[in-house]
């Protein structure tokens, strides 16, 4: 007798370990994550020592990790995870200067994303939507260390750059982007074209990120404010939770900072920035799309290329997550895909051609 087709297997749920010294945060995360049918919380731990045993016993697919904990700090534990049992890690941090600095250090150490603890400025409802999305994206992306890079060489400024203030470089990134952007800017000279950056990152963390870029690159990097001019040697970073657009104002470019709905599930959105650059700067722009999950920025980069801008993508081998550049390449938005350490020289080469 024919028993008919076997019933389809349910998709495997994402196994998550929550590590936080706050019992309240552990309970909230467990409750909110467990409410999603695609996620299973396989354990919670108050410190890295308890977490270590659970990692070995229960093999989580994703770990949420508080960076400020007793007994062993989250950064030290993150290094151990990446060395001995690489696992996608979402760093959870308080909105404080110390927490922001630690979160950026964690991203540099291999964490795939960062988010804020719920509080007065960040409701549990907002946190839940972000947390579930980040867990699913982290599980899909997996963990992958970027290719090792040589120390950056600061390139010489092409002579043509000094003769123009009309050029602008737009850089968009997500997962792995904080390190990639830092490497690019560290290799650019003080006279490089003005740069606008959209990096997917929560509110307030972008301020710490901009400060880190300033300290590490020597360029005048800061979190953008509406009406600021984009001039050579400056780097304006889109503030978290708000979109950044470029517009022409006479002979110069200025940025607009706007609220509004998320685009491609993100605010700030790379697509929003790239599309505005296409309209405002056209052939005077260079667009760069870097490592990151999803497809934000691909359509906007295509709009830039269609408007005459030069476009570059980070190649697969040097990406932490080859998502955003991959979609951009598939859309025909990219002129050249390059290893991370060749992107800064390419920016200067293209700027020199345009200024010559």
From Swiss-Prot:
UniProt superkingdom: Bacteria
Any one cellular-component term (Gene Ontology): cytoplasm
Example of a GO biological process term: chemotaxis
Listed InterPro entries: CheB-like (IPR008248), CheB_C (IPR035909), CheY-like_superfamily (IPR011006), Sig_transdc_resp-reg_Me-estase (IPR000673), Sig_transdc_resp-reg_receiver (IPR001789)
Post-translational modification summary for this protein: Phosphorylated by CheA. Phosphorylation of the N-terminal regulatory domain activates the methylesterase activity.
Predominant cellular place of this UniProt entry's protein: cytoplasm
Annotated catalytic residues: 174, 200, 296
GO MF, any single term: protein-glutamate methylesterase activity
EC numbers for this chain: 3.1.1.61, 3.5.1.44
Positions of modified residues (4-aspartylphosphate): 66
Function: Involved in chemotaxis. Part of a chemotaxis signal transduction system that modulates chemotaxis in response to various stimuli. Catalyzes the demethylation of specific methylglutamate residues introduced into the chemoreceptors (methyl-accepting chemotaxis proteins or MCP) by CheR. Also mediates the irreversible deamidation of specific glutamine residues to glutamic acid.
Family the entry assigns: Belongs to the CheB family.
Domain notes from UniProt: Contains a C-terminal catalytic domain, and an N-terminal region which modulates catalytic activity.
Name assigned to this protein: Protein-glutamate methylesterase/protein-glutamine glutaminase 4
Organism: Anaeromyxobacter dehalogenans (strain 2CP-C)
Gene: cheB4
């Amino acid at each position: 007798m024919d028993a008919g087709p076997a019933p389809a297997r349910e998709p495997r749920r994402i196994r998550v370990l929550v590590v936080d010294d706050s019992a309240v945060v552990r309970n909230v995360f467990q409750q909110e994550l467990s409410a999603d049918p695609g996620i299973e919380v396989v354990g919670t731990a108050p410190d890295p020592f308890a977490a270590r045993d659970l990692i070995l016993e229960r093999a989580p697919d994703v770990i949420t990790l508080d960076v400020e904990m007793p007994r062993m700090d989250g950064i030290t534990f993150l290094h151990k995870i990446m060395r001995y049992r690489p696992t996608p890690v979402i760093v959870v941090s308080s909105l404080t200067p110390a927490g922001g600095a630690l979160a950026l250090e964690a991203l540099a150490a291999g964490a795939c994303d960062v988010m804020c603890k719920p509080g007065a400025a960040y409701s549990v409802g907002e946190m839940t939507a972000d947390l579930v999305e980040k867990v699913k994206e982290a599980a899909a992306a997996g963990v992958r260390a970027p290719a090792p890079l040589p120390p950056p060489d600061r390139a010489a400024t092409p002579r043509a750059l000094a003769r123009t203030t009309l050029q602008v470089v737009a850089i968009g990134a997500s997962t792995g982007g904080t390190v990639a952007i830092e490497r690019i800017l560290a290799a650019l000279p003080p006279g490089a074209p003005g740069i606008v950056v959209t990096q997917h990152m929560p509110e307030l963390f972008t301020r710490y990120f901009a400060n880190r870029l300033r300290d590490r690159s020597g360029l005048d990097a800061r979190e953008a404010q509406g009406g600021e001019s984009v001039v050579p040697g400056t780097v304006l970073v889109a503030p978290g939770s708000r979109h950044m657009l470029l517009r022409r104002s006479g002979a110069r470019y200025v940025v607009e900072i706007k609220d509004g709905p998320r685009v491609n599930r993100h605010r700030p959105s790379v697509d929003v920035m790239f599309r505005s650059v296409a309209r405002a700067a056209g052939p005077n722009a260079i667009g760069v799309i870097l490592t990151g999950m999803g497809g934000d920025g691909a359509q906007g980069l295509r709009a830039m290329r269609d408007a005459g801008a030069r476009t570059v993508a980070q190649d697969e081998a040097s990406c932490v997550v080859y998502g955003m550049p991959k979609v951009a390449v598939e859309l025909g938005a990219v002129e050249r895909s390059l290893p991370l350490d060749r992107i800064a020289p390419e920016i200067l080469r293209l700027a020199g051609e345009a200024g010559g």
